[in-house]
Amino acid sequence: MLSGSPGQTPPAPFPSPPPPAPAQPPPPFPQFHVKSGLQIRKNAITDDYKVTSQVLGLGINGKVLRIFDKRTQQKFALKMLQDCPKARREVELHWRASQCPHIVHIVDVYENLYAGRKCLLIVMECLDGGELFSRIQDRGDQAFTEREASEIMKSIGEAIQYLHSINIAHRDVKPENLLYTSKRPNAILKLTDFGFAKETTSHNSLTTPCYTPYYVAPEVLGPEKYDKSCDMWSLGVIMYILLCGYPPFYSNHGLAISPGMKTRIRMGQYEFPNPEWSEVSEEVKMLIRNLLKTEPTQRMTITEFMNHPWIMQSTKVPQTPLHTSRVLKEDKERWEDVKEEMTSALATMRVDYEQIKIKKIEDASNPLLLKRRKKARAVEDAALAH
């Protein structure tokens, strides 16, 4: 049973954020307004919504149920998270980003007791259009074209561009987190599930007195670039699948992520085989190569991606029929494995990038710092001797 937190009086009605604006082509260096003032309602969610047992999906941190606004009968999606700092962070980052037209919109947030535990309940718009690749699989005989692939990548790119501009890395951009608002032809594609989202900070390591990076020179890289590059790698994989129907990396042994597949990802071993790639331009293949570079710091940034002619001028991209829908249909029974492989690859990448942190100055082996430390100790010893 859901109930409001004991001893709490309901606040003034939760201010619903304005509905997302229609998608607009982003300028080269967009300036985004960040939503602020997340207010969490303490009254029981059942005061305002009818909660059903229909499960719409499973997020990384909780299940998603269908609910209805009691006043308007409008349907929404409800995500339930056990209250903890990680859940609060997910809600906060998602709230900040939900103004973007290509990110699922948060309507309300509640703090309620459920089975004696404090939970956060996130009311979101209901995305009824299904997953990106399911929609392409279900097209029937209608050809899927290169121009459509370009338009889809532009939509996903706009979501990532918005996030990166407000210093958020999603870190879990994958097929099942890309959903359409409805089954209609003009439905909007949206990014969901902020369970792995991370705030990135753009500090200059050179001016930080107490730390020094040990993985690379401080002027080259701050850790935030690794988190954002994870999203760029995902864009490369999704773009590759859109253009041919199968992933660039795969497991030979039916495992979620085999050692061989891990090696291929790290070594960047993939091909553009015919017939699926015979009609795709070299320019597009080069765009994928720049997204799937093995060295994260060399990957294309989201600004570079959005400024690429294939993305920026999607209306001029040729309507070349692709093999994608046929291949996706033929390999339908293997699609769950493909999704699992990408989930595992992203998990591996997040773990790898977490290792690339900043080392405390006491543990660093910078020769200049060692010399200064030795000199400081000598001065201290001399002072003690007197």
UniProtKB/Swiss-Prot annotation:
State the phenotype upon gene disruption. No visible phenotype. Mice are fertile and do not exhibit behavioral phenotype. Mice show decreased production of inflammatory cytokines such as TNF and IL6 upon LPS-stimulation. Impaired cytokine production make mice less sensitive to LPS-induced endotoxic shock, but more susceptible to bacterial infection. Moreover, the amount of MAP kinase p38 is significantly reduced in cells and tissues. Mice lacking both Mapkapk2 and Mapkapk3 show further reduction of TNF production.
Where is it localised? Cytoplasm; Nucleus
Which UniProt keyword terms apply here? ATP-binding, Cytoplasm, DNA damage, Isopeptide bond, Kinase, Nucleotide-binding, Nucleus, Phosphoprotein, Serine/threonine-protein kinase, Transferase, Ubl conjugation
For this protein, the Enzyme Commission number is 2.7.11.1
Its protein name is MAP kinase-activated protein kinase 2
The protein's assembly and partners: Heterodimer with p38-alpha/MAPK14; this heterodimer forms a stable complex: molecules are positioned 'face to face' so that the ATP-binding sites of both kinases are at the heterodimer interface. Interacts with PHC2. Interacts with HSF1.
Name of the gene: Mapkapk2
What is the role of this chain?
Stress-activated serine/threonine-protein kinase involved in cytokine production, endocytosis, reorganization of the cytoskeleton, cell migration, cell cycle control, chromatin remodeling, DNA damage response and transcriptional regulation. Following stress, it is phosphorylated and activated by MAP kinase p38-alpha/MAPK14, leading to phosphorylation of substrates. Phosphorylates serine in the peptide sequence, Hyd-X-R-X(2)-S, where Hyd is a large hydrophobic residue.
Task: Tell me the outcome of changing residue 329 to R.
Answer: Leads to constitutive protein kinase activity
